[in-house]
Amino acid sequence: MKKPLFLTLLCVLSLGLFAANNKKPSERELVSQNMPEIEAPTKKYKVLCFSKPYGFRHNSIEIGKTMMEVMAEKTGLFDVTFSEDLTEFAPDKIKQYDAICLNNNTHLQKGMKDEKMRETFINYVKNGGGIFAIHSATDGGWKEYVEMIGGNFDGHPWGAGGTWGIANEDPNHPVVKNVYKGENFTIKDEIYQYKDFDRTKNRVLMALDLSHEATGKKNGKRADKDYAVAWVKNYGEGRVFVSSLGHNKEIFYHPEILKMWAEGFRFVLGEVDVDTSSVPKPAAK
């Protein structure tokens, strides 16, 4: 073989190996790499992931579905059914699910207009169903829905392109104690402020850290400066977990957020019991 040809082939091979070694992982691979291990579940549950928005459609909906699929596979906690069809909320169908993931389904009230379907859904939760609400699942709803979720979207001064301070207000709580080892942190995402939010009816786990300079400079609407980011609650016999985080795609493969979400699912499915009693807002430092 002539030397120039040999060198050319060697260069091509080297470039191929370099490209292979530097290939960016897919979003699914990132979710899988960062999905935490959990305690072995006592059973396999059934979860509906409902992803139909009736307002703004987030481009993170698809990776939300990927996250659900990977969590189901890697933890063995549940089997998941994906749907954008409201017939899944019919009485004979909804009862088969142990919990429902509301995956960025903005303005659900605009789709679920039938009063009987609304009543069926709310009673499903009151009678023991679980709700795992991501980001814009808190945007809209009707009176009973907002009561069940715990708050209603009222703008987002903390935009998706910014990095904001998050206070872990309940660092010993099972759902968040392993997130950054219970410490405060910063994260890049869109953070909501809420109306119809009453801390005494929710167990706030995380909230905006207004002592963080960029976060504190934004003008929120609440006189009490209470901007919850994640909480748990009971609604009748049902269990509800809410995450304001979930606008940016990166949240769905963020290793620390996945820790919280995995434990949130264990709670809403009834795999573990956690304290949902309200705690006062910590005094500002």
Label every PLM stretch briefly.
Residues 45:
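Nucleotide donor/acceptor-binding cores
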Residues 49, 56-140:
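Helical hinge/lid and interdomain linker segments adjacent to catalytic or ligand-binding clefts
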Residues 28-33, 158-236:
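Catalytic beta-strand/loop cores that center a nucleophilic Ser/Cys/Thr
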Residues 55, 135, 161-163, 180, ...:
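Active-site rim elements
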Residues 106-182:
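A glycine-rich, often tryptophan-bearing local segment used as a flexible ligand/cofactor-contacting loop or short
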